[in-house]
Amino acid sequence: ETSYTLNEVVPLKEFVPEWVRIGFSATTGAEFAAHEVLSWYFNSELSVTSSSN
């Protein structure tokens, strides 16, 4: 069994709008494969401000 690890820090603030949803996508072409996310960490330094609607 082959195992791969991907570890990448991406400054999302430079690429995405203020409100965004994060997800995963993977493919192997025509072959079958199982893709497992064994660990996920997300950190945000977003300053939350309250607003009256």
Curated annotation (Swiss-Prot):
Tetramer of two alpha and two beta chains. Keywords: Lectin, Mannose-binding. Belongs to the leguminous lectin family. SUPFAM superfamilies: Concanavalin A-like lectins/glucanases. Pfam families: Lectin_legB (PF00139). This is Mannose/glucose-specific lectin alpha 2 chain. Transmembrane segments: none annotated. GO terms for molecular function: D-mannose binding.
